[in-house]
Amino acid sequence: MVQDAQRKRVGRIGEGIAAQFLERKGFKILARNYRKPWGEIDIIAEKRGTVRFVEVKAVSRESLPDVSREMDYRPEEMVDVRKLRKLARTAALYMEVHKDKREYQIDVVGVILVEATRKARCRLFEQALEGNL
């Protein structure tokens, strides 16, 4: 129970950090936590006319099994094909409901939080459906 609460807290913090990270990279945040019964999209953003549906995967550095190998750890690899399919389905519905004809894509942001120093390391992987993770 405590671990689940900790995981949710890290996820919530990670999503906020990812949104700020994307804004600094020139993205406009359109929505956050878009939910449907079969899935949720953490961040919906736009950049250069393309709608971006962003899945955020965040972990706390303190929870890593081997902190010395932090640079090798990739939280974005936790996004599997099943999750990508759910994201694609939810994204398509969002575009249909909003009658949005623009191009869209699925992106992933991996976040490693260093809670002791209140810092984070973020990585953006664009076009995740193309196997860019």
Model regions and ranges:
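Active-site metal-binding core of divalent-cation-utilizing nuclease and nuclease-like domains
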Residues: 24-53, 132
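Solvent-exposed beta-strand sheet faces enriched in polar/charged residues
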Residues: 33, 57, 107-109
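Domain-level recognition of nuclease-like catalytic cores that cleave nucleotide substrates
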Residues: 96-133
